[in-house]
Amino acid sequence: MTVTYAPRTDAPRLVAGKIRDVDVVLDLGPGISPQPYLTRCLHICVDAHRPYLERVARERAGDPRYVLLNATWDQAIGMFPDKSVDSVFALDFIEHLDKQDGLRMLREAERVARQQIVVFTPHGFFPQSYDDPGKPDRWGMDGGYWQTHRSGWAPDDFGDDWDIVVCHDCIELDQNNQPMARPVGALWALRTLSPPTPRRHQVVKDPSVWAHVKGLLEQGLPPPVFRRLQSVWGGVLRRIGRA
């Protein structure tokens, strides 16, 4: 296990540098905030509270990259074959499960993920409960039951194969979105399951045919060969007056 300590100003950037750019993401319990790290992927969001997903659907305006499943995490993940998604994200989620369910979720995430698991959670137990069923959650919605904290997590809960980033001043707001007198710590836990692989789909930013072909060649040819081909093609364009 590797444990790195970072202040709030540095931790998010440090974590982002460890997350792989992949094609297919399974996002467990995202609430109204799907994982923000990867934006070019097929993004499967699983949440037990339907109003959260309905809000995501409105705010994403029908973005076809999002697949929204209204189910509990264990109902949904059990339908996925082994190694059927690239990465599993569980951000601000595992603390809402009791400890045994949380450990079971990590095992299931390892089963279905090809490349990486990414977890974010408070460091240790951070009390948060909604005993009054009529009390709205922090977003003014009726998801209090799902926002109750039922477990606390520390680096040792994850095991030797995990990469941990701890931030002792990460969480500044309480469950009512009010500033706390003293920030609460949090941690990111990342488990990398396989060597890095290139994305399987070329994203075309320039719609021209040449730009698309150039991207494919750059991806597939050794760098010296591509640079030589690019130089020769540039010379041709200059000679015919199209450079």
Where are the model-predicted features located?
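S-adenosyl-L-methionine-dependent methyltransferase catalytic module, highlighting the catalytic core
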Residues: 4, 75, 98-242
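Intrinsic-disorder/low-complexity coil detector
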Residues: 6, 11, 29, 50, ...
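Class I SAM-dependent methyltransferase Rossmann-like catalytic core
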Residues: 1-19
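Conserved SAM-binding loop
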Residues: 14-129
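N-terminal low-hydrophobic presequence detector
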Residues: 2-3, 30-31, 49, 86, ...
